[in-house]
Amino acid sequence: MALPVLFDCDPGHDDAIAIVLALASPELDVKAITSSAGNQTPDKTLRNVLRMLTLLGRNDIPVAGGAIKPLMRDLIIADNVHGESGLDGPALPEPSFAPQTCTAVELMAKTLRESPEPVTIVATGPQTNVALLLNSHPELHRKIARIVIMGGAMGLGNWTPAAEFNIYVDPEAAEIVFQSGIPVVMAGLDVTHKAQIHAEDTERFRATGNPVSTIVAELLDFFLEYHKDEKWGFTGAPLHDPCTIAWLLKPELFTTVERWVGVETQGKYTQGMTVVDYYFLTGNKPNATVMVDIDRQGFVDLLAERLAFYAS
């Protein structure tokens, strides 16, 4: 039986590829997709969800737009990474259908209520929508199997020296998620920076030869340019968000540890930092499964295998 999934995202090149991977995987039943503000403004990330689902021929999936800003802060976007549209590079189709008239939180709550079994929430942007859901619907916590997030790191950052972008945008929301009592799975920079897609991998995807694999290759062409900056020391583009979906499909590709994680919301230098109690110094019970390593080649092979799905 397919695993029911709610997908909250802020497309974003890597979010878009995570959508492609999820919808090529019969192991997953994506019940709804909600958009968050982060990689681009909320109107653009919502439109990008609709554009991707139009490309994939999946206008049957309900879509709703989420919060327009973080819980307590002004919005920060990553247009320097993802471009003016949020998905610069390929020529994507215009949306062929409209989003739901309800909010993201309302769609999430409806989906949870109607599901006969607990649902896995995958969140690959800031945690604002998920935190709002948890705060406004405590009665639905029991309907959430786990929350799988892309965010955070153990001791490094990609937006500040201490903070990863998704957590930095809305640290208060992330803290609500981590302390909710619901199992959290964290795909942080420790693992996603190892999930690099090289130029030869992109050409492998392109050679698959279907319209979706071509778009994915063109997304990666654009995404790779930003990551060529010498400061990163990368040999490719880290494909952050698809790690969440890959973990659901093939957890054996990842090395994980069970640890307590908190989020710094006040620090002068460390705002947005995920504090991972690696050596059990706090005495706090672990609240997260933290990914620390990945079989990169296995990850690339999984992407290539699932891109072939779209040939049919």
UniProtKB/Swiss-Prot annotation:
Coiled-coil regions listed in the entry: none
Organism domain of life: Bacteria
GO biological process, one term: nucleobase-containing small molecule interconversion
InterPro entries, sorted: I/U_nuclsd_hydro_CS, Inosine/uridine_hydrolase_dom, IUNH, Pyrim_hydro_RihA, Ribo_hydro-like
Protein keywords: Glycosidase, Hydrolase
Enzyme Commission number, as recorded: 3.2.-.-
Keyword Hydrolase assigned: yes
Example GO molecular function: uridine nucleosidase activity
Family statement: Belongs to the IUNH family. RihA subfamily.
HAMAP family, per the entry: Pyrim_hydro_RihA (MF_01431)
Purpose: Hydrolyzes cytidine or uridine to ribose and cytosine or uracil, respectively.
Stated name of the protein: Pyrimidine-specific ribonucleoside hydrolase RihA
Organism the protein comes from: Citrobacter koseri (strain ATCC BAA-895 / CDC 4225-83 / SGSC4696)
The gene coding this protein: rihA
